[in-house]
From Swiss-Prot:
The gene is ddrA. ssDNA-binding protein that contributes to the ionizing radiation resistance of D.radiodurans. Plays a role in DNA repair and genome reconstitution, in a RecA-independent process, since DdrA is essential for recovery from severe genomic fragmentation as a result of exposure to severe levels of ionizing radiation in an environment lacking nutrients. In vitro, binds to the 3'-ends of single-stranded DNA, protecting them from nuclease degradation. Thus, DdrA is part of a DNA end-protection system that helps to preserve genome integrity following irradiation or desiccation. Belongs to the RAD52 family. It comes from the Bacteria. Induction: Induced to high levels following extreme ionizing radiation exposure. Also highly induced in response to desiccation stress. This is Single-stranded DNA-binding protein DdrA. InterPro entries: Rad52_fam. Homooligomer composed of 8 to 10 subunits; probably arranged in a ring-structure.
Amino acid sequence: MKLSDVQKRLQAPFPAHTVSWKPAAFNAERTRALLLAHVDARAVQDRLDAVCPDDWSFEMEVVSGAEVPTVKGRLTVLGVTREDIGEAPEGSMAAYKAAASDAMKRCAVQFGIGRYLYDLPKQWADWDDARRGPKHLPELPEWARPDHERTPGGAHLVQAMEQLRYELPEDLDLQREVYKHLKAALGSIHPVPTGPVPTNPVQGGRAA
């Protein structure tokens, strides 16, 4: 088995209940937050166990001299290795565990695992500062859900989008026409988000 044989399974969207949302910025009153989607390292491990349980490994080493707890991760899947750096806020040894999880997720993105989360639109949502979480979780679009969670219409739409990636017309004018209609359709589904100007962005907010 080669990496190319399992690429689509690795890249498949995660179940909606495994996707969490973290704030990237707040309004001045901290009643609204700009949310980014992410999954935790355990979801990444579960995906690797499901696709290639005996053919992946993760190694890490602490990066000395860094300003914040930093870990260099090395993820190997079916003989292919990817490396990346994970960071966490200052703290005790628990911060290094968080940095290791961050490194693993960033390495996994290089294999396509969870990469689609970067394509999700950023959303402003009501924020419960006492509970340190959004009052209501955003809805994931159809294309960001696994097959069994999609409506029949949504599944057909995703299939058509996938086909469009490989069957674009060669004529440049036709490509522009396709792009115009696609942009209009996506704009009606996900209008440009509006929200207060962020006053205190959270460092390191990223989806992965």
